[in-house]
A protein has these predicted regions:
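Short C-terminal domain-edge/linker segments immediately following a structured domain
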Residues: 28-31, 79-80, 105-108
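Conserved phosphate-donor/acceptor-positioning beta-strand/loop module used by diverse small-molecule
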Residues: 67-89
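Conserved nucleotide-sensing/catalytic segment adjacent to the nucleotide-binding pocket
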Residues: 1-65
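Short glycine-/polar-rich loops that comprise or flank the Walker A/P-loop
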Residues: 45, 69-74, 117-121
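Conserved GTP-binding G-domain of TRAFAC-class P-loop NTPases and closely related GTPase folds
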Residues: 83-134
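Conserved nucleotide-binding/hydrolysis micro-motifs of P-loop NTPases
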Residues: 3-5, 55, 79-84, 129-132
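Small/polar loops that bind or transfer phosphate-bearing groups
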Residues: 50-51, 77-78, 125
């Protein structure tokens, strides 16, 4: 829900003063808005692109529910180790708690087998194999 958070004027104002506090203040409101938009799309049968870390056990049930609504799910997982993610965050000059990076990675690795059983199509991409200095 990064794009939603970054579009909020309150986040932008807070970010200009202190990026860590801006993240801590606006992450949950952005997440709330993101899930509301997802629900709106599902209720209206819209095509949906849901970009997320998928590091939440609740997403197993979410994807099952989405499938029950007749949606096909195509999941693309970007294989990026916590070390790679932390480097990228530093280059983006965007705050995200480092301890959460590892926590999310561990959760995602644990959930991937379940996701692979649910989704219609699963792709694991490793862009770092073809690009230098990620």
């Amino acid at each position: 829900f990064d794009a939603i958070m970054e579009a909020l004027s309150g986040y932008q104002a807070d970010y200009s003063l202190d990026r860590e506090n801006a993240f801590l203040r606006w992450e949950l409101p952005a997440r709330f808005l993101g899930y509301r938009l997802l629900l709106l799309g599902l209720r209206n049968g819209w095509p949906i692109l849901f970009e997320h870390s998928n590091a939440l056990r609740e997403h197993v049930d979410l994807y099952k529910k989405i499938k029950s609504l007749g949606y096909r799910i195509h999941m693309v997982c970007i294989d990026a180790t916590p070390e790679m993610v932390i480097k990228r965050l530093a280059r983006r000059n965007r705050f995200f708690p480092e301890e959460q990076v590892k926590k999310r990675w561990d959760c995602l690795i644990d959930l991937l087998p379940e996701y692979q059983k649910i989704v219609d199509d699963f792709k694991l991409i490793q862009p770092w194999k073809n690009v230098e200095n990620l």
